[in-house]
């Protein structure tokens, strides 16, 4: 079954909400076509970091009341147990792969191996947040001697199933939510911003306890597709 994404505005709003960012929704910022041939890109030093990865879990958006949520959780207890055992190891090589891609473009790229705790960073508090990072990355600029920072921020992983109160309205879907941003650390302007809002249903039946192989396969395909989306603009 092909990937299904929500309407663009809804996806962007959801990514922003999940990232804990107040204010206007940040729209995508495409990487400039001549970015890798520009003098600015060639002379600066760019760090690559990934946020702490969330633990895969289930969510039931739309099951708004406490009793609704209890019913949804009870009906999917076996599925939730399996989803919580899903791995995130497949994502961990991504930052190093991005460093390699940037080096092949002739950039001075360095890997920041320690996972970034985005929530612990101070807010930037820009008067006009349009196309600006929401967090202040100044400490990383100083610590690592950086001019720019590429941040992979994954906010949610797992399986979600939409509800209307007590009633499911769709099949469960594997999800990956987050964003990628390339930040000019001199101004905190976004040189690239890619929201990630991916979902995929199982191919065929999903309700196959105890291992739920259809949903498991969908989850790992979502991870693969998300990584490809991030790497592709850096490999042109």
Task: Please state what every model-predicted region is.
Residues 9-19:
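Bacterial N-terminal signal peptides
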Residues 101-151, 160:
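Short, solvent-exposed, polar/charged sequence segments at loop or secondary-structure edges
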Residues 163-168:
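Outer-membrane beta-barrel translocator domains and adjoining extracellular loop/strand segments
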Residues 91, 130, 169-171:
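Short capping loops/turns at secondary-structure boundaries
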Residues 1-10:
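Bacterial N-terminal signal peptides that target proteins for export
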Residues 22-119, 123, 234-236:
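A structural "domain/chain start" motif
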């Amino acid at each position: 079954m092909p990937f299904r994404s929500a309407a663009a505005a809804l996806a962007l709003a959801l990514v922003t909400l999940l990232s804990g960012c107040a204010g206007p929704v940040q729209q995508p910022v495409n990487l400039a076509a001549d970015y890798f041939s520009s003098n600015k890109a060639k002379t600066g030093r760019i760090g690559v970091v990934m946020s702490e990865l969330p633990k895969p879990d289930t969510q039931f958006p739309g099951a708004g009341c406490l009793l609704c949520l209890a019913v949804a959780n009870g009906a999917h207890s076996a599925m939730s147990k399996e989803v919580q055992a899903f791995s995130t190891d497949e994502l961990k090589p991504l930052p190093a792969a991005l460093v390699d891609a940037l080096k092949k473009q002739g950039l001075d790229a360095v890997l920041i191996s320690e996972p970034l705790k985005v929530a612990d960073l101070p807010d930037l508090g820009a008067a006009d947040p349009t196309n600006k990072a929401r967090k202040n990355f100044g400490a990383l600029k100083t610590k690592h001697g950086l001019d720019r920072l590429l941040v992979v921020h994954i906010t949610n992983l797992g399986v979600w199933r939409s509800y209307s109160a007590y009633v499911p309205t769709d099949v469960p879907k594997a999800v990956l939510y987050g964003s990628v941003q390339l930040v000019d650390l001199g101004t905190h302007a976004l040189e690239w911003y890619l929201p990630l809002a991916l979902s995929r249903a199982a191919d065929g039946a999903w309700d196959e306890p105890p291992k739920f192989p259809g949903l498991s396969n969908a989850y790992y395909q979502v991870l693969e597709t998300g990584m490809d989306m991030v790497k592709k603009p850096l490999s042109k």
